[in-house]
C-alpha cells in the first residue's frame, strides 16, 4: 500500500489542482461547473413542441459540437435505431450527424431524408466553424429546394452575440439557443448542445 509520505505528495498535488480549478471558477472560465444548475425551461418547451413531428434529425457540427452527441446516441439508443420505423422508434426521429465535409456522407444522409420531414440543428460554439458552415450550406439548399419555410425546420446552437451563424440565425429568424461562452467543447455535451439533442 501507500505510506503517509506518498499520500502527502498526492494530497499536495490535489490541493494545488483544486486551487487552480477554484481560481478558474472565480474568473468565470470554468463554466462547466455551473451546468447542473442551468435553466432548461426554454429547451424543454422547444423539445416538447417538436416531439413527434419529424422522421429525421440532422445534427450539423464537428468536434465538441458532435462527439458528445454521438456518444450519447451510441450509449442510449438501441443498436440499429435508425433502421427502425417511426412507430418502432416511439415517434422519435432518426439521428444523423453531419460532422465532416465528406460529400459522400452528406449525400447519403440527405438521400435517407425528406426535406419536409427533417429537422436540422446546427451547432458551433464560435459560429464560424468552416466544416459546419459548409455542411449547413449544402443542407440549407436541400431544404430550400424542398420546402417553402426553411426557418421552421432549423434551429441553431451558437455564440450568443458573435460569429457568422449568429448573424445568419438573426437574419433568417431561426430558433436559437446559446452555447455558454465559458464552457469548453469537451464539456458541451452537458450543456444545451447535448441536452437538446
Language model feature labels by segment:
Residues 1-51:
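Extended, charge-enriched "interface" segments that sit outside catalytic cores
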Amino acid at each position: 500500500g501507500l505510506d503517509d509520505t506518498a499520500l502527502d505528495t498526492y494530497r499536495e498535488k490535489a490541493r494545488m489542482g483544486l486551487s487552480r480549478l477554484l481560481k478558474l471558477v472565480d474568473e468565470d472560465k470554468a463554466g462547466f461547473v455551473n451546468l447542473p444548475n442551468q435553466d432548461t425551461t426554454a429547451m424543454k418547451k422547444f423539445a416538447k413542441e417538436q416531439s413527434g413531428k419529424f422522421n429525421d434529425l440532422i445534427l450539423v457540427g464537428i468536434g465538441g459540437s458532435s462527439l458528445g452527441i454521438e456518444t450519447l446516441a451510441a450509449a442510449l439508443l438501441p443498436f440499429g435505431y435508425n433502421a427502425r420505423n417511426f412507430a418502432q422508434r416511439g415517434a422519435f426521429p432518426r439521428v444523423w450527424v453531419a460532422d465532416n465535409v465528406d460529400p459522400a456522407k452528406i449525400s447519403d444522409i440527405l438521400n435517407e431524408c425528406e426535406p419536409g420531414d427533417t429537422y436540422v440543428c446546427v451547432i458551433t460554439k464560435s459560429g464560424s466553424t468552416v466544416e459546419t458552415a459548409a455542411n449547413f450550406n449544402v443542407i440549407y439548399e436541400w431544404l430550400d429546394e424542398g420546402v417553402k419555410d426553411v426557418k421552421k425546420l432549423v434551429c441553431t446552437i451558437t455564440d450568443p452575440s458573435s460569429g457568422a451563424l449568429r448573424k445568419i440565425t438573426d437574419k433568417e429568424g431561426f430558433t436559437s439557443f446559446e452555447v455558454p461562452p465559458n464552457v469548453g467543447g469537451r464539456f458541451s455535451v452537458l450543456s444545451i448542445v447535448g441536452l437538446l439533442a
